[in-house]
Amino acid sequence: QTLALSTTSNQCSLKCAHCNGHYLNNMVPIEEYEEKVQSRNITSFLLSGGCSYEGDVPINTHINTIKNLKEQGYRLNAHLGLMDKDSIVELCKYLDIVSFDLVFDDETIREVYKMKKSKEDYIEVYNTIQEHTEVAPHICIGLKGGQIKGEYEIIEYLQKNPPNKLTFIVLIPTKGTEYENVEPPELEGVADILCEARINLPDTEINLGCMRPRGVYRKELDQLSIMCGVNRIVLPSRSAKNKAIEMNMTINECKECCVL
């Protein structure tokens, strides 16, 4: 019941190594949201889009539409990227939560995003958002071409001020991108990171997000996630549900974005 909207249609200036604008094609242009709402039982929106060369998602260009959505009672989650402080302050008046990718390895930032940004830039924006609305940090495991670089450092940083929610996603080698021929991170390494987060952030709700490889990898990852103490899995495989039942867990099904 959460509809993903792109504020830039299928356009992205960064053309990142792991995405190349591919996933924007799965989103609805924000100008067309009304017809989709009429045909589906939509209760919330994910506001997203492609990035500028500076790494921000320019959803503020549609602030009147965003304000209108909020006034209609929809819950709003957003991707802001490395947005400037003034725009963050203005937008957060209408946002229930922000999903924010944290990247701490400078080499990864240069290789994946082609930006001259640093860990400090991400921390600064993260803290600014935190001052004005709830933020759910996102960690992409294996972002640097399937390599684990910087993920543990992010978990260590989050221990200082644990978030209510933390979402993990996993690199998908995607056709038409620079990383189409790489291997996703090894499952053992992914599981170790999930366990590290669970142990060190005991009161944080940990989610396994929608962006993760499909097939056998996904089935095995989903089962491992249950065993690592993950709280929510987006579109879980049957094997994950069976594992949860086997472990006598209570299963609650939600219909919206995992951070809402």
Task: Put a short name on every predicted segment.
Residues 12-19:
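Short cysteine clusters
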Residues 16, 47, 100, 197, ...:
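Conserved, mostly hydrophobic/aromatic
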Residues 51-53, 80-84, 104-106, 141-145, ...:
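Active-site-proximal loop/turn and secondary-structure-junction residues that shape catalytic pockets
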Residues 152, 159-260:
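Auxiliary Fe-S-binding modules of radical SAM enzymes
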Residues 112-115, 140-148, 179-187:
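Short, surface-exposed loop/turn motifs that are enriched in glycine and acidic residues
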Residues 69-74, 134-137, 201-206, 226-228:
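Short, surface-exposed connector motifs at secondary-structure boundaries
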